[in-house]
Amino acid sequence: MKDFSVLISIYCKENPLWFREALDCVFAQTVQPAEIVLVEDGPLTPELYGVIDEYSKKYPIFKIVKNETNLGLGLALRNGVLAAKYDILARMDTDDIIPKHRFETQLAKIEEGYDVVSCWSTLFLNEKDNIIAVKTRPEHHDDIVKLAHKRSPVCHAAAFMRKTAVIEAGNYLHRQYYEDYNLWVRMIMKGAKFYNVQESLYDVRTTEAQLNRRAGFSYLKNELEYLIEFYNMGFYTLGDLIKNSSIRIVARLMPNGMREMVFKKIWNHKSAK
């Protein structure tokens, strides 16, 4: 199997215990990365620096990229992509959990010639035994493209990507909460090929605050601007824009309790219970 880089961005509000757990998952993989590109997006806490120092000494494959100020996830990952040595990139977030065979499974698939390979994901609240849902996604490229006309068709944190294809599409841009969806659309329009493994290979940790954060007028305003951008790019039809905007207006402005129920419906979640 080919060498690959793991791409991680971290900022000051990350939980050092969860970060340690995520790194342990990486180093427990059946296939190991040749490089970990860790982007420090602005100054971190002493606790986070301590974890980085400990693991980088134990595993000398870290390439640390330092942003003097917090640039946001999109621009942080943009710098990480440019710094990566290898063409195959494996995304990973700092608070998530993965099974031991994730890298091996996705690496084998991307070596078949795909540009982006992701998978299903399991959403859990705070701790792994508190599963909220399992999020399924279509397997094949044409169905993935169809879903992209409604919402992001790929679990971003679980994605394997080809650096060359990412850069050809313009690399990551600053699109708060839409960094991934924006990139996937541009990659699709450049002819990149997508695949989703039909297995949950990624456990996404969330909190009540994160679930409630994606709501309100400010969030909705940014979201509608990004959807209009997809229309102006020629990816969305006018019908796509009207339908997707209408759904989001309702979802972002409703009470939090109702939003969780709609969240599972709109974003294709299947209850894990």
Q: What residues fall within each predicted segment?
A:
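Short, well-formed alpha-helical segments that are part of the catalytic scaffolds
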Residues: 13-28
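A conserved acidic beta->alpha catalytic loop
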Residues: 40-49, 69, 93
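Glycine-rich, basic loop-to-helix element that forms the pyrophosphate-binding segment
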Residues: 67-84, 105
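Short aromatic/hydrophobic "clamp" motif used to bind/position activated sugar donors
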Residues: 89
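Conserved donor NDP-sugar-binding/catalytic core segment of glycosyltransferases
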Residues: 101-132
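Short, flexible, basic/aromatic active-site loop/helix in glycosyltransferases
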Residues: 120, 134-152
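Acidic donor-binding loop at a coil-to-helix junction in glycosyltransferase catalytic cores
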Residues: 176-183
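Catalytic core of nucleotide-sugar-dependent glycosyltransferases
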Residues: 192, 204, 212-237
